[in-house]
Amino acid sequence: MSWGTELWDQFDSLDKHTQWGIDFLERYAKFVKERIEIEQNYAKQLRNLVKKYCPKRSSKDEEPRFTSCIAFFNILNELNDYAGQREVVAEEMAHRVYGELMRYAHDLKTERKMHLQEGRKAQQYLDMCWKQMDNSKKKFERECREAEKAQQSYERLDNDTNATKADVEKAKQQLNLRTHMADENKNEYAAQLQNFNGEQHKHFYVVIPQIYKQLQEMDERRTIKLSECYRGFADSERKVIPIISKCLEGMILAAKSVDERRDSQMVVDSFKSGFEPPGDFPFEDYSQHIYRTVSDGTISASKQEGGKMDSKSTAGKAKGKLWLFGKKPKPQSPPLTPTSLFTSSPPNGSQFLTLSIEPVHYCMNEIKTGKPRIPSFRSLKRGWSMKMGPALEDFSHLPPEQRRKKLQQRIDELNRGLQKESDQKEALNKMKDVYEKNPQMGDPGSLQPKLAETMNNIDRLRMEIHKNEAWLSEVEGKTGVRGDRRHSSDINHLVTQGRESPEGSYTDDANQEVRGPPQQHGHHSEFDDEFEDDDPLPAIGHCKAIYPFDGHNEGTLAMKEGEVLYIIEEDKGDGWTRARRQNGEEGYVPTTYIDVTLEKNSKGS
């Protein structure tokens, strides 16, 4: 099957068909372009969605801690990667399919134009040959008619007796001329006819089949290219399926990582105040004044005039003594302490404890007149909320447990900063010693400002650590005292409750809080431990000497080539490493002279 033999007379049809093929190719390229735009918009919308639901975190406190939140953010990360794969699909289609189609369409147009021009030229040449043959034919036909006319004229004059001999001779010459011209045109016509037939045969059996064959091959290549683009279109999607599957697996793993028990524990860690729950309501004895007698020697408090105390006067005194919740006590009233509840007043010399009337009377009036202490954390939340004001430096606006955590975090950060400054100070001192011993390496005085700044930073950090440790000890001391107070007697419980607000809010008055000594755990502060050199430093790795080192300078350690030493301190940037022999001798060696191997758990420490 060949277009050149089967479609030898369908030049115009082939022209239209090849144009349709290129148009179809461009139409498919337009389809791919729109699909690319869809993929790009889809990826862009996914990224915007991830950006919208992944909040910007300005501090560590805003980082997600709950496993459900972490899982959601992991899902967002996987979705972001998924959006990246959609972009990969779009890029692959744009490069491998759309770009290839547009280049191939341009090449097809050029090739088709060239083949059609060759066909038109061949047809024009054949038409020119036919025109020449037709002109020679017409000329031969005309000359033949003229020769026939000349012959008829000659025969007429030759048969005419009246014609002169000159006229006959002239007619004969005219006949011979026309006959000769007719013969020449006949030969010309025969030659043109033979030439046209040859060109026509060549046109329809050689030139046109060759051109049509090229058009056929061009169209078949176009079809093959479309098939390849169809396959590439699908391959662009199939290539990212494994990565997309990993993204989906990551989402599933994120879903499996959700731990409800851990989230519940985080809620406890985040909102635990450290307060004890409110205690039981004490028994309110309204009949105690009935049995009170003036002759009772154990009740040695101030006696009331009239000898009898009514409920109104009792309520009035109770309201006057509720200074923890409203009014402030008079200066002459001593603060109430648990030890003042009991007095030792043996009338006959025997040792026994009796209740003093004023504390008991005070507590009973508190019970009868004070606002009932309903177990509610509304006041706690209101008292400790950060929205009530700016955060204080000692975190006293927080509940004890949260305050302790914040202070501990700050102490840890300050200790890390102190360690960094101490390392820098040590490195500067080493560099200063090197400069003093080798002045050509640098000026020791140039390091003095940096050393002074480092010392100031160390002093400042130590003061901050000491201050925060004092606050931490205060919090721990309060927590211990309040915990012990829960196990006291009912009377002691009443006094303790008298130091709390009606709604259970916490008061931090130094004159009202019975504080125990700070909890000492028998450990020194961290910056004290940093300067203790009683114990040898642990080895963090080992090294092998590449070159020998004499170690004449003070503080250095001589070594031989190939000798193995212990590393007890890394190079701080000054070019020296602290090493130790097996016999315990320590010193500094040049870092470039040794091959260092550090333990994995000691790197970066």
UniProtKB/Swiss-Prot annotation:
GO cellular component: cell cortex; cytoplasm; cytoplasmic vesicle; cytoskeleton; cytosol; plasma membrane
Lineage top rank: taxon: Eukaryota
SUPFAM superfamilies on file: BAR/IMD domain-like (SSF103657), SH3-domain (SSF50044)
Region listing for Interaction with DAAM1, DIAPH1 and DIAPH2, in residue ranges: 541-605
Keyword Coiled coil in record: yes
Parts forming coiled coils: 66-258, 392-484
UniProt cross-references to InterPro entries, sorted A to Z: AH/BAR_dom_sf, F_BAR, FCH_dom, FNBP1L_F-BAR, FNBP1L_SH3, HR1_rho-bd, SH3-like_dom_sf, SH3_domain
Positions of the record's site feature: Mediates end-to-end attachment of dimers: 165
GO terms of molecular function: GTPase binding; lipid binding
Family of this protein: Belongs to the FNBP1 family.
UniProt-recorded name of the protein: Formin-binding protein 1-like
Source organism (scientific name): Rattus norvegicus (Rat)
Organismal lineage: Eukaryota, Metazoa, Chordata, Craniata, Vertebrata
